[in-house]
Design a protein with these regions (language model features):
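Short, highly charged C-terminal tails/helix-capping segments
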Residues: 120-130
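Catalytic glutamate of the conserved HExxH
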Residues: 106, 110-114
Length: 130
């Protein structure tokens, strides 16, 4: 019997995805903390107007690089949250992608927000890669 991928397993996939990104990309991003949780907190979902916790697979939290200032540095590094259960749910529903590829996709999407890109910008970039 195979067990469902754990938070630690998904964190390992995310770290491998991060390490596999081109060095210039990682250097430009600067310090980014990757956190894996089962779900987003209820308060966050309420703030975002999301009723179904399975709708949020990832979240960028921090000051995007277009807003960052040397004169007023952020007291905390940027954080990317990956939500295990929604990612697993999407992975099972899709059935056409590996879990590692889906984790990488969500991670890159959220890092795109770190660079100040909108969802539309990120989708345009992804469409150009296909």
């Amino acid at each position: 019997m195979t067990l469902a991928p754990s938070i630690d397993h998904m964190a390992d996939l995310a770290e491998k995805a991060w390490a596999g990104l081109p060095e210039p990309f990682r250097a430009a991003a600067g310090p980014v903390v990757i956190r894996v949780l089962d779900f987003a907190e209820d308060e966050l979902l309420a703030e975002m107007g999301i009723e179904d916790p399975f709708e949020l697979t990832g979240l960028y939290h921090g000051v995007d690089l277009t807003q960052a200032s040397v004169a007023d540095p952020s007291p905390r590094p940027a954080e990317v949250f990956l939500y295990r259960r929604p990612i697993l749910d999407e992975w099972v529903e899709r059935g056409d992608v590996t879990l590692a590829d889906l984790v990488e996709h969500v991670l890159i999407h959220e890092i795109g927000h770190h660079f100040g890109l909108s969802d539309d910008d990120i989708h345009d970039i992804e469409d150009g890669r296909r």
